[in-house]
Amino acid sequence: MARGKIEIKRIENSTNRQVTYSKRRNGIFKKASELTVLCDAKVSIIMLSSTGKLHEYISPSTTTKQIFDQYQNTLGVDLWSYHYERMQENLKKLKDVNKNLRKEIRQRMGEHLSDLSVEELRDLEQEMESSLKMVRDRKYQVINNQIETFKKKVRNVEQIHKNLLHEFDARDRDQHYGLVDNGGDYESVLGFSNGSSPVFALSLQPNPPNDLHSGVGSDLTFTLLE
């Protein structure tokens, strides 16, 4: 039974397409190798897959460059001359641009002005004034930014100073600020243990001011600790 004819069209499935490409590429390279051995032919094959991957085959008796050189000599064409001419044209254009830029730079530095006409000098003057204005505006912008940053730092320092003043003021208003009620154990407050050297301990008793004149007793009592 005869085999059905396979329709030649693009394989839509990417996996199947890559598998088919790999199989047929190997088959072509095998045929090229057979031509090289059986017929003493010089074969060069360059293949690019749909993913851009390069595959090539070259007969062991030659090189890719030799194949291209022989191709050019046989057909009488130069594959590289066109590209070389394009490169030379681009190089010339770049040199001209570079020359003009250097000339403009020297003119803006006050050099090579003798060949300029009055109109050209006026245009150059306007360009330099415009450039000077842009530089000056940028300078003022940088200065203003630095001033604003400095003002923010000053405001932060002033706020810290204000908070500290409020804290000290609160301490002055609160008579018991920082005192610890430990039941009269002044030795533990002062950090002395039994058997230490005699010291005078200050006992603070918040009695009314009138007691000073009534003879009840002073709010300051000195006790000798032994």
Curated annotation (Swiss-Prot):
Chief localization: nucleus
SMART domains: MADS
Superkingdom assignment: Eukaryota
Gene3D superfamilies for the chain: Transcription factor, MADS-box
GO biological process, one term: regulation of transcription by RNA polymerase II
Entry keyword annotation includes Transcription: yes
Entry comment describing in which tissues the protein is expressed: Expressed during flower development in stamens and petals.
Domain K-box: residue ranges: 84-174
GO cellular component terms, A-Z: nucleus
Compartments (UniProt record): Nucleus
MADS-box domain mapped to chain residues: 1-61
GO terms of molecular function: DNA-binding transcription factor activity, RNA polymerase II-specific; protein dimerization activity; RNA polymerase II cis-regulatory region sequence-specific DNA binding
Main function: Probable transcription factor involved in flower development.
Protein name, entry field: Agamous-like MADS-box protein AP3
Organism phylogeny: Eukaryota, Viridiplantae, Streptophyta, Embryophyta, Tracheophyta
